[in-house]
Amino acid sequence: MADVRFLLTGDTSVCVEFGNEISEAINAKIRAYNIALQDSKIPGIVETVPTYRSLMIHYDPEVILCAPLMEELRGLLGKLDQIRIPPSEVIEIPVLYGGEEMGPDLAFVAEHAGKTQEEVIQIHTSTEYLIYMLGFTPGFTYLGGMDEAIATPR
């Protein structure tokens, strides 16, 4: 995998970067690599944090030094084709749309998209979204799959 980069991000972490775009293909590589890493049981791994295009690996340098860790991490790349990624779980989340208190953005999204509010709701609820990563606020998800017909600037 020529496009994979290993970036030292401090004295206790390494970032394995799989590309420079947000895509389901890169997400699948990150998930497979994370599973391979967990299965390898490399001593000293403290935590892994998947992102849109990379996997941050936190490690304990008193258990494993950087050079041997990097060798182990590079070795995992050849195993990704053998990893079975578990199927995604669909979680349905109830949503309340509209009104000043519950959904003040609905009118803006509809106007921006040139749609009725009902059309925006239909488009929004007829799509399955992929969770790429969890954010800094507990439970906050970064999703992919927004229909371009209702995509709006932040």
Regions found by a protein language model. Give the residues of each.
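Conserved "landmark" site that anchors the functional core of diverse proteins
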Residues: 1-154
